[in-house]
């Protein structure tokens, strides 16, 4: 096989001109953003969803999620991931599955789902799709499935299949994050202890999927074996970096959230214990006063 090498300076100066304005991406994101703005604007009033409008922070988070999707799929990162580097593709996947969904969910007011929950069939489907067992399984199965080398290569070769892959990534990632971040009363998040178990499972799943990729002695993705070499990275090094990006990136994020939730839960438990102890002291004090009053009345 004859390897093609790019001059670093020439490549670096030209890569910034590689923007891919795919109509399906632009139209899809425009529809999603338009629907969101309608729901938090005219739709909120017309449907009587809430007297409380979406906050500036919520709007900023949702719009940020759309911008990140847009940049991930049309910017030079897309060119790098589709034609040169497996590691760039994994960075793209990190953005689409671990950064975009939390921002998107945090940007949706809890009252936005009231119309859906009024229809029994839709409410049943929504509860099913946000069940933590379903969300955990769906995300990890989809993520693992699309990283099988043969299917991965096919998705990169065919744009429509690649679009489907990204749609499945984002949709199942939103499902995966929902039990952790929901602000909806109708579709509430799980308890703090359950969140910790959930995050621990996600961290382990990331290791199981990407450890074989990271520690493989041979390149697993034929597509990148035949790709031009840039930045003096050979195929195996690129693959190892990609595996580390996913394994470490996902693991660090999940464990950081685990620690944060644990500390919050532990503090709440301490506060509850102190509150119960205080109430018990007050009850005992009232009992003692009552007993003293009774004894005094008897003696008198």
Identify the residue ranges that each predicted region occupies:
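Alpha-helical membrane segments of multi-pass proteins
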Residues: 2-300
């Amino acid at each position: 096989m004859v390897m093609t090498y790019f001059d670093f300076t020439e490549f670096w100066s030209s890569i910034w001109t590689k923007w891919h304005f795919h109509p399906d991406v632009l139209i899809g994101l425009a529809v999603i953003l338009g629907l969101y703005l309608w729901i938090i604007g005219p739709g909120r009033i017309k449907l009587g969803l809430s007297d409380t409008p979406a906050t500036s922070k919520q709007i900023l988070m949702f719009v940020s999620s759309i911008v990140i999707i847009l940049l991930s799929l049309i910017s030079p990162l897309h060119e790098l991931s589709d034609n040169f580097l497996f590691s760039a593709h994994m960075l793209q996947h990190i953005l689409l599955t671990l950064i975009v969904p939390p921002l998107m969910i945090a940007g949706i007011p809890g009252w936005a789902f009231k119309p859906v929950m009024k229809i029994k069939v839709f409410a049943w489907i929504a509860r099913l799709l946000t069940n933590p067992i379903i969300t955990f399984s769906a995300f990890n199965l989809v993520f693992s499935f699309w990283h099988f080398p043969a299917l991965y290569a096919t998705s990169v070769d065919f744009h429509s299949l690649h679009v489907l892959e990204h749609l499945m990534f984002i949709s199942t990632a939103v499902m995966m994050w929902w039990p952790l971040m929901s602000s909806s009363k109708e579709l509430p998040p799980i308890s703090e202890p359950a969140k910790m178990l959930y995050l621990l499972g996600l961290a382990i799943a990331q290791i199981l999927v990407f450890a074989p990729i990271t520690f493989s002695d041979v390149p697993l993705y034929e597509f990148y074996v035949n790709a031009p070499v840039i930045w003096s990275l050979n195929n195996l090094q690129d693959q190892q970096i990609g595996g580390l990006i996913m394994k470490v990136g996902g693991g660090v994020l999940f464990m950081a959230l685990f620690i944060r939730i644990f500390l919050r839960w532990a503090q709440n438990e301490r506060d509850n214990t102190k509150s119960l102890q205080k109430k018990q002291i007050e009850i005992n004090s009232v009992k003692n006063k009552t007993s003293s009053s009774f004894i005094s009345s008897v003696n008198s």
